[in-house]
């Protein structure tokens, strides 16, 4: 028996808020991503990997399960009286950049182990899109081993930029912006290494096999992305530029 299980359950919260009365040159209320040394925005990386032995004749049961449940909430909120005297743009911004990866698979091919794989990928702006595909196969002869891999990704991402009330007066432009850039991958492989070689080829020699193996690969992805930019009713906005 060779079984591997990896589970991540996480919550990431980022809040930037201003309350009360303030007078300044310009204001930037931002719940967003830090920058690297070159000034480029970074991204959150959330990764779960589970690797087990292959399901083959000399392994009775081999399985890998990777479960990735992650919630991200970025909020930029203004509620008060703000006056910006500079012509430079003032803004309220919530922005999320993230890459979510879930992988489950066997550590190596064993003689006679057929393979199956299942993967789902998605990219989202304010909403998420995903696609799923899967296959499994087995051989036939003397002994039988069972190998299975399962990958589950549940990702809920929100970015809220909001002016909840008060009076906003700016000499320049005023913007309320919400952005989500989300890349998601759920990759599952049974019987073969979850990491292929540089050419994406398997090195398993399946000719003249003497054993049988039953492999299954299942991937499930549930992704929700919601980006909201709002100026609440009752809020007064007086801008010298564009809104």
Residue ranges and their predicted role:
Residues 1-243:
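Low-complexity, glycine- and small/polar-enriched segments
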């Amino acid at each position: 028996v060779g079984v591997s299980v990896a589970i991540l359950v996480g919550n990431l919260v980022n809040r930037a808020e201003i309350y009360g009365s303030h007078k300044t040159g310009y204001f930037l209320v931002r719940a967003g991503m830090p920058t690297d040394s070159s000034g480029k925005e970074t991204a959150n990386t959330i990764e779960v990997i589970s690797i087990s032995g292959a399901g083959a004749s000399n392994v009775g049961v081999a399985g890998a399960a990777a479960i990735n449940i992650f919630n991200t909430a970025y909020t930029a909120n203004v509620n008060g009286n703000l006056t910006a005297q500079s012509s430079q743009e003032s803004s309220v911004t919530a922005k999320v950049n993230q890459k979510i990866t879930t992988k489950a698979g066997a550590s190596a091919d064993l003689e006679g182990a057929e393979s199956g794989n299942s993967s789902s990928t998605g990219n989202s702006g304010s909403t998420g899109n995903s696609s799923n595909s899967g296959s499994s196969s087995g051989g036939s002869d003397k002994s039988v081993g069972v190998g299975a891999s399962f990958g589950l990704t549940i990702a809920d991402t929100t970015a809220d930029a909001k002016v909840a009330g008060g009076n906003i007066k700016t000499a320049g432009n005023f913007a309320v912006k919400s952005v989500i850039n989300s890349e998601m991958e759920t990759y599952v492989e049974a019987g073969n290494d979850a990491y292929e070689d540089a050419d994406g080829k398997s090195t398993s020699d399946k000719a003249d096999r003497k054993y049988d193996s039953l492999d299954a690969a299942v991937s499930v992805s549930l992704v929700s992305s919601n980006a909201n930019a709002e100026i609440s009713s009752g809020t007064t906005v007086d801008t010298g530029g564009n809104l």
